Swiss-Prot record:
Gene3D superfamilies: 1.10.132.30, 2.40.40.20, 3.30.1360.140, 6.10.250.2940, RNA polymerase ii, RNA polymerase II, clamp domain, RNA polymerase Rpb1, domain 3. Keywords: DNA-directed RNA polymerase, Late protein, Nucleotidyltransferase, Transcription, Transferase, Viral transcription, Virion. Belongs to the RNA polymerase beta' chain family. This is DNA-directed RNA polymerase RPB1 homolog. Its EC number is 2.7.7.6. Induction: Expressed in the late phase of the viral replicative cycle. Its main location: virion. GO terms for molecular function: DNA binding; DNA-directed RNA polymerase activity. Part of the viral DNA-directed RNA polymerase that consists of 8 polII-like subunits (RPB1, RPB2, RPB3, RPB5, RPB6, RPB7, RPB9, RPB10), a capping enzyme and a termination factor. It is found in: Virion. It holds the Pfam family RNA_pol_Rpb1_4. It comes from the Viruses. It comes from African swine fever virus (strain Badajoz 1971 Vero-adapted).
Length: 1450
């Protein structure tokens, strides 16, 4: 009878009690001895029944040696019970809620029935139970006190009498608790409180203890500390009397009390870490045991942290053998090849089973042995099931079928190649090994274009390489992890690889028109030589004579025709910036490839560069597959490099030198910048700088200086005039996108300009206001603050060099400090999203809980997308009719077609105009990513056709229209199946929406007016190709899209954080570095956000085009507190007087004059009789009042309304220049009195509190709006003719701070277009769906052009909002989303705490996702393992072919 097979569906966690320990234990530890002679002592802590770690003896329980024995636990029967150290808090809860006399609950259990199970006992224990009378025995419940200086001692305080609760007493109390009480308080029967006090503790198996005997030979033997702790525990236990009985309130001997306490401490140290290094009781609250000079180790210490069992052993990948070395470039290798040193190849072994078909190939390895490469090291003999070293074999040893040969690595083997950190799945790729025969080479070699997969370079990076052993693993590796699978990026949907640096320049030079001296014109022989190393099918040169000349375009076309494509785009080489300074050949300003032939233009970064979405290699990959694209990259690279080697290309210092005239012009530009900076300095010295609200004078001055010292665009003019673009290597590198940028060129040739550290100029760090010792005190010239006039080629002075090094040092430190934060953020994202897997309906779910109804809302794989343009979007109604309405045949069908196109256009506009209105910077565009480029398919079909121009046929036109209409109608069935399509079952709305964009594009590109020259057969072929590509673009079942999203967001987010020092200081916001990403992913509430902002559109269209009116509204909503209007204030203790008779502070004696005038002008505002001696004198900032349009009257009225217990006097508003506005606020006696009319003891404290309230008083504005500025917006609208018009004269208000509700109450603000960056504020007012959209837009705003495909952002947003509340990606968010997945939460962090809570709650953990199955030792259901494979064994048996029968058939 065969054994059954089943998978573990779930795991339940419970508290283990005495019975559990006894049932699992194989023996009882009774003595503290370890060994008797060379064998373990029977009954000791090394008893052989618990396993073996020594080769001298076997395990008595299972009779296995040390490698096969898994270990078996033992038990230690305690003479006195001990508390379970992991559940001290749980013990205290139970003691608070149950009667110590009868075990009945003290609290009313019905009050907690509405709570979820885990919360019931916690809430009951937090209620007031002291002094309550038991409902059953009427005993009064005492106060339970936990010892402040001890971790596990409880005291009972009853009417002043304090008794100690020993574990034995607690055990007796808990034994009286009924199971019904346990269940009603939310705990499981398996978590009865009696289990929290143990009489029998478990001794772990020997095999899992951290160590064994360390002492060997003479001298005392040494054992690992954890064994010593167990030894002490056994010895102390023997000192306790077996029949010890402890009665509550009874005194016990001091020595026994100390022994009981020591046993409890030893058990604590045995399970948990010791936090104290003292062996006696101290003030830390816990006692610890010291082993020599270090605290004792523990069992639980092995679980957490990176080196713990969970992360290192259970979740970490392990291989038998691995190699690691530095990488270097080798362009002779294919992109999917890796050069492997021969010394490594002879060390790393590959296991290969001998078969009939490979025995002849393996025999040379067997004969060579270890003496000669390629050889082998050992042989596994199937008959004897033993391993033999190859050097110790006898002469008659034969290699037979079924044996396993451990041979050397040879060329052609597949290997995993990896560079850490592995932030993306492309960080582990499979390459084919090419063994490097040169023994002096000891580095891995790879093609320079392959670095993009690993984010590697050749500045000392090291990588890992290991070879899979079994045939199955080798096949899986090649199919699943081959680098061709990573050619298209999941993050950006574009190609990862392409030409870099030299090959980019070489491709440009080879394909240029009229190259100087005709360098790219060659004869037949030279053209054939360029193809020598391409390793492709050589083109036919038979049609060319030796004297015929070929240009570079012809040579490249010979290569491109092997994979014909159509391509048209402007190259990187052509730039409007350079156009005024150089002459462009008309044939080089647009690159066009038609059916594989380069008609015009050049190949540069935009066409063949790495990461060029929509470039040549992207199109080849989409049409012919990624393997062909990789071959074409290598072939083009070889062509370009061979050409560069022959024609020559270099960058020398001559390319970096300016002519004297150009140098003079550069100096004039720099001198103008310095002059402007000096003018700003003069304005500062004369007090003429007026900063806006929210900025200090210093901050505004620095901002003016930064703007003034920026190099203008015209500095390129002298550079371009002094170089020859046709021959200058540096310029060609920059212009073609091979390397460098315009700022790099300016720094090298003209000047470096202002050095910024953290977006600020160099600030004075030395004493006495100096930036460096080279400059005097308080120097204001730009050079003293980091402005470098010289260029790199001209050389830097000492202070200039130091300024440059300061910037480099800041970047270095910034990167080092950010690495740990970004690494942990990546790990949290991986664990938070890893359970999201695509099911058979292409839904995304966590186990059975839905996250997305359809992945990415369209079910498409991010790697299978192309960028296309929707032609109808920007057209007016008349333009749309002229271009797309077919009038050749009078039929209502074509009216219907045009109406459908118009509706599609309007729908598209409506959707994306709403997106534009509710985002800060995402403007409407007619370019989108779709799975099928319909225009390209049509073009390819027409180019491959030989029928020419066809006459119009009314019947065929109607037939083609019907075909397209039917196809668009049935397109959503691609998500279902053909059966449902034949039955025409109703299509769900969400599937119709998923295919909406694709159907729009098909109707546009296959409109009747555009397909007149297409036959019905061609139309059928086009539609079939569209359906095929669309189907192939769908996401695969079992895809771990959560991990893909985490990797795609975390990697560019890491780069964003490292580049945070480039942020802008404008606007007063702080969206920099790690702050804003943490706010988004941590789901912080509104009050905790540091960088929230709002964009407010104005309701009146006339006002939103007037900046002055918009600024007035911005001033009115900006929160102005009294403190912002004050220059200085004083709290004075003086007697009020309106004359000079009474003594006043001498500095303010002049106030009497305006105080007298105030009383004369305001006869109704006479001082009250109860004025106290406390006065607050304030001087107002007139400049701020003018800029914010705040009158003195409004300030006084606001203060009087909010502070009635004061008497306020003020000077006139229109004071002379230089004389401030003064307000005196006198406190009244009522402010110092209680309701009992008794005077408070500290009048000064009350006066200070009143000052604080005064300063924080709101004068005007919306709470939460710290700053409001007018910004210029760019938006679209549809005019009366139906044309999409771009408006760039709209003014809106951008605020620092958020309060959507407050903004909606303002009559000047349009409530329908309020945009807030705060997820919490959006959620509070608009609901969870709005918060979901806000998460997407905020991640996109933060990451900018480095943002990933929007499907990954949707994954983040849907997961964070799935529960109906915004949950974070932190530990708390994971607990809320997946409370039952204990193993996943344990793998993320704090495994001890997670396991403890799970045991208390008796949690049941269903096994799903990735972490849980991995921890349980099974394979997660993802990818190719998602689907079960059903095998018909009967069919296989009946159709089995032996080797002989196959030979006979052949």
């Amino acid at each position: 009878m065969e054994a059954g097979y089943a998978e573990i569906a779930a795991v339940q966690f419970n508290i283990a009690g005495d019975n559990d320990h006894k049932r699992q234990g194989v023996m009882e530890v009774t003595i503290s001895n370890l060994f008797e002679g060379t064998l373990p002592a029977e009954g000791g802590i090394y008893d052989a029944r618990m396993g073996t770690t020594d080769h001298h003896y076997k395990c008595i329980t299972c009779s296995h040696q040390r490698k096969q024995c898994m270990g078996h636990p033992g038990i230690l029967q305690m003479h006195a019970p001990v508390l379970q150290p992991l559940f001290i808090a749980e013990i205290r809860r139970w003691l608070r809620v149950i009667c110590l006399n009868c075990g009945a609950p003290i609290v009313d259990l019905k009050r907690y029935e509405h709570l979820i199970r885990p919360k019931r006992l916690i809430e009951a224990a937090s209620s007031q139970t002291e002094g309550k009378q038991c409902y059953v025995c009427k005993a009064v419940h005492p106060k339970i006190v936990k010892d402040s200086e001890d971790y596990f001692t409880f005291w009972v305080d009853q009417q002043g009498k304090i008794d100690k609760l020993y574990p034995q007493i607690i055990r007796e109390i808990f034994s009286r608790v009924t199971y019904d009480t346990v269940v009603k308080l939310g705990r499981s029967k398996n978590s009865h409180p009696e289990k929290l006090v143990l009489k029998a503790i478990q001794i772990p198996p020997i095999s899992i203890r951290p160590g064994i005997r360390l002492g060997i030979g003479s001298g005392p033997q040494s054992f690992h500390d954890i064994n010593n702790v167990i030894q002490y525990l056994v010895r102390k236990n023997l000192l306790i009397p077996k029949d010890l009985q402890i009665v509550r309130g009874q005194k016990i001997p001091l020595n026994i009390d100390r022994n009981l306490q020591t046993i409890q401490q030893l058990y604590y140290n045995f399970l948990l870490d010791s936090v104290s290094t003292t062996a006696t009781q101290g003030g830390t609250g816990k006692r610890g045991i010291v082993m020599g000079a270090r605290p004792a180790p523990s069992i639980m210490r092995r679980l957490p942290r990176k080196e713990g069992r969970i992360r290192k052993s259970l979740l970490g990948s392990q291989v038998w053998s691995i190699s690691r070395s530095t990488i270097c470039g080798n362009s002779d290798l294919h992109l999917d090849e890796v050069g492997y040193p021969i010394s490594f190849a002879r060390t790393l072994q590959v296991a290969e089973t001998v078969q009939h078909y490979n025995i002849n190939r393996l025999m040379p390895y067997f004969l060579n042995g270890k003496r000669q490469y390629p050889g082998c090291s050992r042989v596994y003999k199937q008959i004897t099931q033993s391993v033999h070293d190859i050097e110790g074999l006898k002469q008659d040893f034969r290699l037979e079928v079924g044996d396993i040969l451990y041979r050397d690595v040879v060329t052609g083997d597949v290997a995993f190649f990896n560079r850490q950190p592995s932030l993306e799945r492309s960080s582990i790729g499979v390459h084919r090994i090419v063994v490097l025969e040169n023994p002096k080479i000891s580095t891995f070699q790879m093609n320079v274009s392959a670095c993009a997969w690993y984010n590697a370079d050749f500045d000392g990076d090291q990588m890992n390489l290991w070879v899979p052993w079994s045939v199955m693993s080798r096949v899986e590796a090649e199919l699943l992890c081959s680098v061709r699978n990573w050619f298209i990026s999941t993050k950006s949907s574009g190609p990862v690889n392409g030409q870099v640096q030299d090959s980019t320049v070489g491709s440009f030079l080879l394909t240029r028109t009229n190259t100087p001296m005709g360098k790219n014109v060659m004869n037949k022989l030279h053209a054939m030589g360029l193809f020598q190393t391409t390793q492709t099918d050589p083109p036919c040169f038979a049609n060319y004579s030796p004297t015929d000349l070929l240009d570079g375009k012809s040579v490249v076309s010979m290569l491109l025709k092997q994979t014909p494509i159509n391509y048209q785009r402007a190259p990187t080489w052509y730039s409007e910036v350079y156009a005024p300074y150089m002459h462009y050949n008309k044939q080089d300003i647009s690159t066009q490839i038609r059916n594989g032939e380069l008609i015009e233009g050049v190949l540069d970064k935009k066409a063949v560069g790495a990461g060029s979405s929509g470039g040549i290699y992207h199109l080849i990959s989409r049409r012919y597959g990624p393997q062909q694209a990789l071959k074409m990259i290598f072939a083009t690279q070889q062509l370009a490099l061979n050409y560069v080697r022959n024609a020559g290309f270099t960058v020398s210092t001559a390319d970096m030198l300016l002519t004297p005239e150009a140098h003079q012009e550069v100096q004039e530009i720099i001198n103008k910048l310095l002059l402007e900076s000096e003018e700003i300095n003069n304005r500062l010295l004369h007090g003429d700088i007026m900063p806006p609200i929210g900025l200090t004078t210093h901050d505004f001055y620095e901002k003016l200086q930064l703007n003034a010292l920026k190099f203008p665009d015209r500095i390129l003019k002298p550079i371009m005039n002094s170089i020859n673009p046709e021959t200058n290597g540096l310029f060609q590198m920059v212009a073609t996108g091979a390397k460098g940028s315009n700022p790099n060129m300016i720094h090298i040739m003209a000047g470096i300009g202002q050095i910024e550290i953290n977006t600020q100029r160099i600030q004075p760090q030395f004493s006495f206001g100096r930036t460096l010792v080279y400059y005097p005190r308080f120097a204001l010239e730009a050079q003293a603050y980091g402005f470098i006039c010289n260029s790199y080629i001209a050389g830097l002075t000492s202070p200039e060099f130091i300024f440059g090094e300061m910037n480099g040092r800041f970047d270095l430190i910034n990167k080092a400090l950010s690495t740990s934060s970004t690494g942990y953020a990546n790990r949290k994202a991986i664990f938070g999203l890893q359970s999201c897997i695509v099911d058979y309906y292409r839904r995304v779910s966590i186990d059975t809980r839905l996250v997305q109804q359809l992945y990415g809302e369209d079910g498409l794989d991010a790697r299978q997308l192309e960028t296309v343009r929707f032609e109808t979007i920007m057209l007016s109604d008349q333009e749309l009719e002229d271009k797309f309405k077919y009038t050749g045949i009078q039929s209502p069908l074509f009216e219907e077609e045009f109406s459908r196109l118009k509706k599609d256009r309007d729908k598209y506009r409506q959707i994306f105009l709403n997106v534009e209105n509710f985002n800060f910077s995402q403007l409407l565009t007619d370019v989108r990513q779709v799975p099928v480029n319909v225009a390209s398919i049509v073009k390819n079909i027409l180019l491959s056709s030989t029928s020419g121009v066809l006459p119009f046929d009314e019947k065929s036109i109607l037939q083609k229209y019907a075909m397209v209409k039917t196809f668009c109608k049935n397109l959503p069935y691609v998500f279902i199946n053909n059966i449902q399509e034949r039955l025409q079952t109703p299509i769900p709305v969400y599937l119709k929406r998923a295919a909406a964009l694709m159907r729009m594009l098909i109707r546009i590109e296959l409109a009747t007016v555009k397909t007149l020259n297409i036959t019905c057969e061609q139309m059928s072929a086009i539609l079939d190709l569209i359906r095929l590509q669309y189907t192939q673009s769908l996401i695969n079942y079992g895809e771990a899209v959560g991990i893909l999203a985490a990797q795609s967001v975390s990697e560019p987010l890491t780069q964003y954080m490292l580049d945070s020092h480039h942020r802008s200081v404008a606007g007063g916001t702080n969206k920099s570095g790690i702050v804003r990403p943490q706010e988004i992913f941590s789901a912080k509430p509104v009050e905790a956000e540091q960088s929230s902002e709002m964009l407010l559109r104005l309701k009146n269209p006339e006002v939103e085009t007037n900046k002055t009116y918009a600024q007035e509204i911005a001033n009115s909503i900006e929160l102005i507190t009294f403190e912002r209007l004050i220059l200085q204030w004083h709290l004075l203790y003086e007697t009020y007087s309106s004359t000079k008779k009474n003594v006043m502070y001498p500095d303010f004696a002049s106030d009497v004059e305006w105080m007298t005038d105030f009383l004369e002008n305001h006869p109704l505002l006479q001082p009250p009789e109860d004025i106290a001696n406390w006065c607050i004198r304030l001087e107002l900032n007139k400049t701020t009042m003018i800029l914010k349009s705040i009158s003195l009257e409004s300030i006084i009225n606001s203060l009087r309304a909010k502070h009635p217990n004061t008497y306020i006097m003020h000077s006139v508003e229109n004071t002379a220049s230089g004389i401030p506005i003064i307000i005196r606020i006198y406190l009244r006696e009522s402010a110092f009195r209680r309701s009992t009319n008794t005077r408070m003891a500290t009048d000064e404290k009350i006066a200070v509190n009143v000052v604080d309230k005064l300063l924080n008083s709101t004068i005007r504005g919306i709470p939460g709006i710290k700053n409001a500025n007018v910004v210029k917006l760019m938006r679209h609208r549809v005019d009366a003719q139906g044309k999409l018009v771009r408006l760039d004269n709209i003014y809106a208000i951008k605020t620092n701070g958020t309060n959507i509700f407050g903004a909606m109450l303002d009559d000047n603000i349009d409530p329908y277009t309020i945009v807030s960056s705060s997820i919490g504020d959006t959620m509070e007012l608009y609901g969870i769906e709005a918060a979901r959209q806000k998460i997407i837009s905020e991640i996109r705003t933060v990451m900018g052009d480095k943002g990933p495909n929007h499907r990954h952002l949707l994954m983040y947003a849907d997961l964070m909002t799935r529960t109906g509340q915004v949950t974070s990606l932190e530990k708390a968010g994971l607990n809320a989303r997946e409370p039952s997945n204990v193993l996943l939460r344990m793998a993320l962090s704090s495994p001890v705490q997670v396991l403890t809570d799970a045991a208390v709650d008796s949690a049941v953990n269903p096994i799903y996702g990735i972490a849980a199955p991995t921890l349980m030792g099974s394979v997660p259901r993802i990818g190719t393992m998602y689907s079960d494979i059903i095998m018909d064994e009967k069919y296989i048996t009946e159709n089995y072919k032996s080797v002989d029968s196959m030979i006979d058939m052949l």
